[in-house]
Amino acid sequence: MSESVHQRLEELKESLHYHAVRYYVEDNPEIPDAEYDRLMRELLEIEAQHPDLVTVDSPSQRVGGKPLSEFSQVTHEVPMLSLDNAFDDSELDSFHKRAQDRIGGESIKQYCCEPKLDGLAVSLLYENGILVQAATRGDGTTGENITENVRTINAIPLKLRGDDWPARLEVRGEVFMPKAGFEKLNELARQKGEKVFVNPRNAAAGSLRQLDSRITASRPLSFYAYSVGVVQGADLAASHYERFLQIKSWGLPMCPETKRVDSLADVKTYYQHILQRRDALPYEIDGVVIKIDDIAVQERLGFVARAPRWAIAYKFPAQEEITTLNEVEFQVGRTGAITPVAKLEPVFVGGVTVSNATLHNADEIERLQVKIGDQVVIRRAGDVIPQVVSVIKERRPETARDIIFPTQCPVCGSHVERIEGEAVTRCTGGLVCQAQRKQALKHFVSRKALDVDGLGDKVIEQLVDREMVETPADLFKLSAGVLTVLERMGPKSAQNIVNALEKSKLTTLPRFLYSLGIREVGEATAANLAQHFKSLEAIQAATEEQLIAVQDIGVVVAKHITTFFEEEQNQAVVQDLLVQGIHWPEVSAPEQGAELPLEGKTVVLTGTLSQLGRTEAKEALQSLGAKVTGSVSKKTDILFAGENAGSKLAKAQELGIEIKTEQDLLELIN
C-alpha cells in the first residue's frame, strides 16, 4: 500500500466529516449531494481494496453491519436523570422560588430554554474525539448499548471536529424522527402493506432498538444534544448555553430554537412563542425545558429523587382537535359497566391518530347534548384515553341522531340496571356475559393479581370464544394438550402457560382477594382486609358493620364485599379455586412490642421503580406498617419517588413532605 492511498483515505474521511456537519448540523451545505455521493463512493472503493484501513470513525460505518443477537447493558457513570414537570405559570413560579430560596435568596435571572423533543434520550461517549459508545437512558442507571445503531445516524458525528474537546466527553441528547421523515416512512409502509407507526416517537424508539443496524440506517433519524455527563481532561464553559455552543463547535447538533433568556418573564414569553410555533416546527415536541444557566448554581442546587433541582419541563396543555362523531358503540367491562365509546372520523391529535374516544356514561352524553353526526372537540393528553369535551352545535347536520343507551346488554342480552346515586349503567349478566367473563379472567391473571406469565389478553379471548373456560378456576383445569388447539400456540408455549398457572397457585391473601375483582376492592383495600381479618373465612363471614371497621372501607365498599360473598355463584368460584390448589401463607400479626419502621405513616409511591415492581413495593411498605395511598395531601408523611416522578413530587415539595428514593425503600426492607 502506498503512502498516497493512506493519505487520500484520510483526506476523504476528513472531507466527508466536514460536509456532513455542514449539511446535518449547520443546515448549510457547501457541495451538491452528487459530489458528496462521489466522495463516499471513492472512500468505499479504497476501503474495499484495503479493509485493514477501515476505522470505527469512518463515514462508511453509517450503513449498518451484522445483526446482533441482543443488546448488552451499559451502566451510566453519571445517572441520566428525568425532569420534574410544570403545567402552568404558577408551577413555574414555584420552581423559580424554590431554587432561589435554596441558594439563600440570591436572584436567578438567566435561563437556558429549549423545546422538549418527543424522542428517545441517549448518551454518546467520545474518547479522544472518537464515538466509542452510545446507550439508551433505560432506568437512569442502566441502559442498553446501541452503539452500532447510533453510528448510522448522520446527524451524530463519529469523530469530533477540532481538537479542544475533553479526552472523555459524554454528550446526552434526544434521537427523534422529523415529521416529514415519519410521514414518508409510513407512506412506504402503506404501499408495502406493512404496519404503520403510531407516532414519530414510537418510530424513533423502534428504529433505534433494532438488532439489525441496517434497518436503523434506513430510517430517517436525527439528533439534538441537550447536556453533558462525564467530562474528563478539560474544563467546559461555566454557562449551560455556552456549553451548547462548545458542543456545536465540535460537530454535534443543537436545537436551533435553543435560547438563553434574562428573566423568568422572558421564560414565559419563550414558552408562548414555542407553543404558538409548535405545529410549524419540523419535529414533535410536548413542552419546553427550562434550565438555570449558571453551572455553579446548578451544582449548588443539586438533585432530588433522581431529578435536578435546577431544571424543569414546562409541558404544553392537552391538544384538542375537531372531528365527526360517526357512531357510538357500547363496551362492557369487568364489573358489567357499560361505557359508550365514540367512533370518530380519524384525526391526528396529541401525537397519534385517534378514531375512538370515551363518552364516559349516560350523564356525560346528556351534559354534552351530543348526537351521532355532530362535529365534536376531542382532547388527548399524554397517555390519557381521548375524550369528547364539547360539541359544536352550530355545525349540527339535519341528519344528526340521538344516542340511545341500551336497555339490554349489547353482548349477552341481559337486563341492564343503573343503581340510584351511581353514574354507571351495568349489565346484570355476571359471568354469563362473555364480555364480563373475558375482563374478569384478564384481571384474575394480571400482574397485580395472580401474575400468570404468558397468559395474555389474546389467549384469554380465544379461551372464552371457544367456550374452554367460564370461571377463573377453569384455567387450572387446562392441559398443555388442550391449549395447543389455540392459534399460534405450540407445545412449548402451552406447557409454559400450564407451568405458570401451577406456579401462581402459591400467592398471598391480598393478591387473591384482589384477583376476585370485587367492585372497588383494589390492592390497598385487599391488603387492609387481609391484615384486619387474617383469613378468607373471616372476610367471607364479616358483616357490613365489621367491614366498616377496617381502614379505608366505607359503607359502599362494605356493601360490595358482602354482596359478592353472598352470591352463590361467587361462593362456588372461590371454593373451586381452593380445590384447584390456590393457597397462601398464613397472615401473621406483628409480634407484640415489635416496632415497625413506618407504623402509622401515610406514604405515597410515584414514578418508575427500577428494582421493585409497583405491587411488590406497596406490599413491602404495608409490611413495614405504612398506609399506602394514591395521592399527595397534607396528611402524607413520606413520598417515595422513582424515575419520572412528576406532579406528585412537585406537590410534595411544596407541602414540605419528606421525600425518599427507591434506594431508601430498599434499605428499609433489608
Swiss-Prot record:
Endoplasmic reticulum among keywords: no
Protein name stated in the entry: DNA ligase
Disulfide bonds: none
Annotated EC: 6.5.1.2
Classification via InterPro entries: BRCT_dom, BRCT_dom_sf, DisA/LigA_HHH, DNA_ligase, DNA_ligase_AS, DNA_ligase_CS, DNAligase_adenylation, DNAligase_N
CC annotations in GO: cytosol
Signal peptide span: none
Database matches in Pfam families: BRCT, DNA_ligase_aden, DNA_ligase_OB, DNA_ligase_ZBD, HHH_2, HHH_5, Nlig-Ia
A GO biological process held by the record: DNA repair
GO molecular function: DNA binding; DNA ligase (NAD+) activity; metal ion binding
Reactions this protein catalyses: NAD(+) + (deoxyribonucleotide)n-3'-hydroxyl + 5'-phospho-(deoxyribonucleotide)m = (deoxyribonucleotide)n+m + AMP + beta-nicotinamide D-nucleotide
Stored PROSITE patterns: BRCT (PS50172), DNA_LIGASE_N1 (PS01055), DNA_LIGASE_N2 (PS01056)
Gene3D superfamilies: 5' to 3' exonuclease, C-terminal subdomain, 6.20.10.30, BRCT domain, DNA ligase/mRNA capping enzyme, Helix hairpin bin, Nucleic acid-binding proteins
CDD domains associated with the record: BRCT_DNA_ligase_like, LIGANc
Role of this protein: DNA ligase that catalyzes the formation of phosphodiester linkages between 5'-phosphoryl and 3'-hydroxyl groups in double-stranded DNA using NAD as a coenzyme and as the energy source for the reaction. It is essential for DNA replication and repair of damaged DNA.
Organism: Vibrio parahaemolyticus serotype O3:K6 (strain RIMD 2210633)
Cofactor: Mg(2+); Mn(2+)
Active site: K116 (n6-amp-lysine intermediate)
Residues annotated as binding NAD(+): D33, A34, E35, Y36, D37, S82, L83, E114, R137, E174, K291, K315
